[in-house]
Amino acid sequence: WGGVVEDNSFGTHEFMRFCELVGCEPYISGNVGSGTVEELSNWVEYMTFDGVSPMAELRKRNGREQPWKLKYLGIGNESWGCGGSMRPEYYSDLYRRYATYCRNYSGNQLFKVASGSNADDYNWTEVLMKQITPWNMNGMSLHYYTVPNGDWWHKGSATKFDEEEYYKTIRSTLGIEGMIIRHSGIMDRYDPEHKVGLIVDEWGTWYDVEPGTNPGFLYQQNTMRDAIVAAINLNIFNQHSARIPMANIAQAVNVLQSILLTEGSKTIKTPTYHVFDLYKQHQDSDLIYSHIQNSNAAEGVPSLSQSASVNADGDVFVTLSNASLSESFKVDIAAAFAGIKSAEGRVLTDDVHALNTFEEPDRVTIKTLAVTVSDGRAEIILLSLIHISEPTRLQLIS
């Protein structure tokens, strides 16, 4: 990438240590395009085997005595394109071969993810579900990027856009829900018990790179437009969480729709970072059915999106976003099965072009939102991106 030397200074040990430091599950992608079965099998053994073998001994010599716990393992990546330009029939056979030799060592249980469809390639999903037995595949990936104009050669600027291009971006990102529904429908025919997850492990905005940067590094800035895109996508993923157990934005740092940007020793949080901060309480909670009265901000662009969940303590979390550039909404929130006794809210809102820079790192940040609770209902003014939480256990009002 970018025509520069890769010195491999950030390898397996450094990546796994990073995951430990930030408290996340590692997700390793195996090379099926140009790598061998033996190479991937050895890598899994190197990382997870707690015994005597050449790979385990090599890991110990490299400074790691105990094996890591590795759950998520991708068997190839974008095998339809840059990962090998394969047909789904051919990849299905390769997957079965490679996956056979990726074994569960020392109590470690792999969650094996097949290289799934590019956007709306439904035939790819059909073939994989038909030819790869569910017991040998825990997940299937889906990749979809939000490109404002649908033109990969002229994607547009991350920061300089007009109202028309803004709404094209939102319309493009909304397209992912139809794809999720159709891919899920195919999967339902072969896997009605939802044993195979749809893993949306590459999503987000993709613009032209920032002027003066290496085109191969895919470095782009991040505005409130990206925050709205992130919120819409996360709401969609929540709504379809029965089939989607995991979704991963691309990427985390300095590439595409990043949550962090760095410059030397400096780090800034992008508007997208703050969206993830607002939405994180949905994780490990249970989806609640929700419905919202809506209007269109532009043709094919609903103004509002939402999702709701409840955690083990009975706390309810509601996330809302407003894609309209011209209209605010007074939103009345009610629970059909209970009354709201107290609520608190946070909001991320600013001009649609607003962004954080190294000179002004906190231009876009989360603020407290006024929430009025009355007669078991909560009311807020929805300017832009909103997070509402119900911090006390919901109780029925008689």
How would you describe each model-predicted region?
Residues 1-162, 181:
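N-terminal catalytic cores of secreted or lumenal carbohydrate-active enzymes
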Residues 31, 59-60, 101-122, 176-205, ...:
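Aromatic-lined carbohydrate-recognition surfaces of secreted/lumenal glycan-active proteins
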Residues 147-214:
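Glycoside hydrolase catalytic-domain groove-lining segments
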Residues 339-382:
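Acidic, Ser/Thr/Pro-rich beta/coil linker or hinge segments at domain junctions
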Residues 386-392:
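Conserved small/polar residues in nucleotide/adenosyl-binding loops
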